From Swiss-Prot:
Keywords: Ribonucleoprotein, Ribosomal protein, RNA-binding, rRNA-binding. The keyword Ribonucleoprotein applies. Belongs to the bacterial ribosomal protein bL25 family. CTC subfamily. InterPro entries: Rbsml_bL25/Gln-tRNA_synth_N (IPR020056), Ribosomal_bL25/Gln-tRNA_synth (IPR011035), Ribosomal_bL25_b-dom (IPR020057), Ribosomal_bL25_C (IPR037121), Ribosomal_bL25_long (IPR001021), Ribosomal_L25_dom (IPR029751), Ribosomal_uL5_bac-type (IPR020930). Gene3D superfamilies: Ribosomal protein L25, beta domain, Ribosomal Protein L25, Chain P. This is Large ribosomal subunit protein bL25. GO terms for biological process: translation. The gene is rplY. GO terms for molecular function: 5S rRNA binding; structural constituent of ribosome. This is one of the proteins that binds to the 5S RNA in the ribosome where it forms part of the central protuberance. Part of the 50S ribosomal subunit; part of the 5S rRNA/L5/L18/L25 subcomplex. Contacts the 5S rRNA. Binds to the 5S rRNA independently of L5 and L18. One of its GO terms (cellular component) is cytosolic large ribosomal subunit. The keyword RNA-binding applies.
């Protein structure tokens, strides 16, 4: 049986700025659950538990099992509002999912094998990750926790694009990402290294 991360929340009766401030002072964070055929639902969550959950990548990219008043529903985390300078979560948004409808979301990218690539081993290039997530569409049951990007064959001066990602069955890039095919990683030789190589070449004395 497929398991999902569980989130426990409580129905929120009071609304407004004053009520939200009182909840924060009591160690709670406000939230909302929307989508599907049910009406939007105001909720509150334990702040510390939520703070630690938000540090996990899977919490942002996986289907969650949200329990409110003893009833469970499948949701995706859609938005998080943080305090501008304090370690404080102000508000979270969850969206209900329909197992029969495709969803659009962002999947984290995990870059692998850069250190064994020709770009790094042969050219001392620097491999840069241009993006760290990509927009995809799939049915909820096919949602990957992350996507792997194999950099083992990248050479200096080359770039990898979105269409180079090996997508699991049932997963596709969203239409606009597929059309734009953006760069996701590139391998470049640092300017200093190029200058050093040129200087070394100029300093060599031709053989008599």
């Amino acid at each position: 049986m497929e398991k999902h991360m569980k989130v426990v929340a409580f129905e929120r009766q009071q609304q407004g700025t004053g009520a939200s401030r009182r909840l924060r002072n009591a160690g709670k964070t406000t939230g909302i659950v929307y989508g599907g055929e049910a009406a939007p639902q105001m909720i509150e969550l334990d702040h510390n538990a939520l703070w630690h959950a938000l540090k996990k990548e899977a919490f942002h990219s996986s289907i969650l099992d949200l329990e409110v008043a003893g009833k469970s529903q499948r949701v995706l985390l859609r938005d998080v509002q943080y305090h501008p300078f304090r370690q404080l979560v102000l508000h979270v948004d969850f969206q209900r999912i329909d197992p029969k409808k495709k969803l659009h979301t962002k999947a984290p990218l995990h870059f692998l094998n850069a250190e064994t690539s020709p770009a790094v081993k042969l050219s001392s290039a620097v491999v840069s990750h241009v993006v760290t997530e990509i927009e995809i569409e799939c049915l909820p049951a096919d949602l990957p926790e992350f996507l792997e990007v194999d950099l083992s064959k990248i050479e200096a001066g080359q770039s990898l694009h979105a269409k180079d990602i090996a997508l699991p069955n049932g997963v596709a890039l969203t239409a606009h990402v597929d059309a734009e095919n953006p760069v996701i990683a590139s391998a470049t030789i640092p300017a200093g290294a190029v200058s050093d190589e040129a200087a070394a070449g100029e300093g060599e004395t031709p053989a008599a």
